[in-house]
From Swiss-Prot:
Broad EC category: transferase
Catalytic activity: (2-aminoethyl)phosphonate + pyruvate = phosphonoacetaldehyde + L-alanine
InterPro entries registered for this protein in UniProt: Aminotrans_V_dom, NH2EtPonate_pyrv_transaminase, PyrdxlP-dep_Trfase, PyrdxlP-dep_Trfase_major, PyrdxlP-dep_Trfase_small, SP_NH2Trfase/AEP_transaminase
EC numbers: 2.6.1.37
Subunit structure, as described in the record: Homodimer.
Gene Ontology MF, one: 2-aminoethylphosphonate-pyruvate transaminase activity
UniProt function note: Involved in phosphonate degradation.
Keywords: Aminotransferase, Pyridoxal phosphate, Pyruvate, Transferase
Name by which UniProt lists this protein: 2-aminoethylphosphonate--pyruvate transaminase
BP terms from Gene Ontology: organic phosphonate catabolic process
Phylogenetic placement of the source organism: Bacteria, Pseudomonadati, Pseudomonadota, Gammaproteobacteria, Pseudomonadales
Pfam families (UniProt xref): Aminotran_5
Family, similarity comment: Belongs to the class-V pyridoxal-phosphate-dependent aminotransferase family. PhnW subfamily.
Length: 371
C-alpha cells in the first residue's frame, strides 16, 4: 500500500498508530456488568502486573480517562493531605506533576533542571537530606516533551534509603523500557493504554503498592479518582464503580496479546530502539540535529532542532509531511524551536525511513535549504 492510499502514520507519543487487530477488537459491544467483561478487565490487570513484576507486592488499579487522570488519582489517593511531595522537573510533564499537587492542595517543593539535563540520584540525596518534611518524591521516567530518560533505578534507591515514597509517571516508558517492581521500590507507577502497549487512549492504570493503597482510605479529594475505593469495589464485585471504557479495555486486551506474541518487553524495546536509531541516522543525513545526546535519549520520541532557514514554518512543514502520509508532533520546549518525531506505535524501521524521505521531500518543496 502506498503512503497516499493508507491512513496517515502517527509518529507521535500517543495516540499512536495501532494494528488492524487492535482496531478490530473494538467492533464488539460489551455490557459493563457482564461477567465476560469482568473477566476481560481482570485478565488485563493480571497481564499488566506481570510486565512490571508486581504480582506479589502491587495492585493494578485501572481508571477511565487519559493518563493525566491516573496521575492525578495516584497523587490524590496516595499522598495524605499533610504529606509533602518533592517534584523533579526537566520538562512540561514534570511541571504538570507540580500543577496537580498545587490544585490538590498537597504541599510540595520542586527541583528543576534544564530540559536536556536529567535529575541525578545525588540531587535527590541532597534534597531529601535538606528537607525531612518530604514524604513522597514524584518524577517522570521518560519526559515526553524531549525524550529524555531520567535515572529511575538510582533515584528509587535513594528515596527508599531515606524512608520516603516514590511516585513514577511512566506514561511514555512502561512496556518498552524495563521497570521491575522487585528491584525498583515505588508506591505508585502510572501508565496508560495508548502508549508503548499500542492500545488506544482512554484508560490509565496505576500500579500501587498494596499496603500503601490499603492505608490510603479517606485521602482522596475526589469520588471518581479515589483509587482505594475503585480497587475495593473491584475486588468485591469484579466491576468498575462507574461506566468503564469497554472498547478501550477490549483493544488493550488484544494489544497485550500482540505484545506477548512479539516477545514482550525485550522485543518491543528492540523494535523501538531500531526505529529510533534509524530515525536519528536518516535525519542526520538531512542535516538535522537532535536536541539530546544519545546517552540520555529514550527510544520513544526524538526532539529535533527546527531548521534555521527563515522560510521554515512548522505549520507548513507539518501539512506537507502529513500529505505524504505521516503526522509529526510540534516541539514543547520553551527556549529553542523544535519539533518531535515519535518512534513508538505499530511501525518499524522501514516506515521510519519512509517518514524521513517524506520530510526531505517536504523541505525541498518548501525550499527550506538551511537545516
Amino acid at each position: 500500500m502506498s503512503t497516499a492510499e493508507r491512513a496517515p502514520i502517527l509518529l507521535t507519543p500517543g495516540p499512536l498508530t495501532t494494528s488492524y487487530r487492535t482496531r478490530r477488537a473494538m467492533m464488539v459491544d460489551w455490557g459493563s456488568w457482564d461477567s465476560d467483561f469482568n473477566e476481560l478487565t481482570a485478565s488485563v490487570c493480571q497481564r499488566l502486573l506481570k510486565i512490571v513484576g508486581g504480582e506479589g507486592s502491587h495492585t493494578c488499579v485501572p481508571l477511565q480517562g487519559s493518563g493525566t487522570f491516573a496521575v492525578e488519582a495516584a497523587i490524590g489517593t496516595l499522598v495524605p493531605r499533610d504529606g509533602k511531595v518533592l517534584v523533579l522537573i526537566n520538562g512540561a510533564y514534570g511541571k504538570r506533576l507540580a500543577k496537580i499537587c498545587e490544585v490538590l492542595q498537597r504541599p510540595f517543593s520542586t527541583f528543576e533542571t534544564e530540559e536536556n539535563v536529567p535529575t541525578t540520584a545525588a540531587d535527590v540525596e541532597r534534597l531529601l537530606a535538606a528537607d525531612p518534611a518530604i514524604s513522597h518524591v514524584a518524577l517522570i521516567h521518560c519526559e515526553t516533551s524531549t525524550g529524555i530518560l531520567n535515572p529511575l533505578e538510582a533515584i528509587a534507591k535513594v528515596v527508599e534509603r531515606h524512608g520516603k515514597r516514590l511516585i513514577v509517571d511512566a506514561m511514555s516508558s512502561f512496556g518498552a523500557i524495563g521497570i521491575d517492581a522487585r528491584k525498583v521500590p515505588f508506591d505508585a507507577l502510572i501508565a496508560a493504554s495508548g502508549k508503548c502497549l499500542e492500545g488506544v487512549p482512554g484508560m490509565g492504570f496505576v500500579f500501587a503498592r498494596s499496603a500503601a493503597l490499603e492505608a490510603s482510605a479517606g485521602n482522596c479529594h475526589s469520588l471518581a479518582m479515589d483509587l482505594q475505593d475503585q480497587h475495593a469495589y473491584m475486588r468485591k464485585t469484579g466491576q468498575w464503580r462507574f461506566t468503564p471504557p469497554t472498547h478501550v479495555v477490549a483493544a488493550l486486551h488484544e494489544a497485550l496479546s500482540q505484545y506477548e506474541e512479539e516477545g514482550g518487553l525485550p522485543a518491543r524495546q528492540r523494535r523501538y530502539a531500531s526505529n529510533c536509531e534509524t530515525l536519528l541516522g536518516e535525519m542526520a543525513r538531512l542535516g538535522f540535529r537532535s536536541f539530546l545526546p544519545a546517552e540520555i535519549q529514550a527510544p520513544i520520541i526524538v526532539t529535533f532542532h527546527a531548521p534555521r532557514d527563515p522560510r521554515y514554518r512548522f505549520a507548513d512543514f507539518y501539512q506537507r509531511v502529513r500529505e505524504k502520509g505521516f503526522i509529526l508532533y510540534p516541539g514543547k520546549l520553551t527556549q529553542v524551536e523544535t519539533f518531535r518525531v515519535g518512534c513508538i506505535g505499530h511501525v518499524d524501521a522501514a516506515e521510519m525511513r519512509q517518514a524521513v524521505a517524506a520530510i526531505g521531500e517536504a523541505l525541498r518543496e518548501l525550499e527550506v535549504l538551511e537545516i
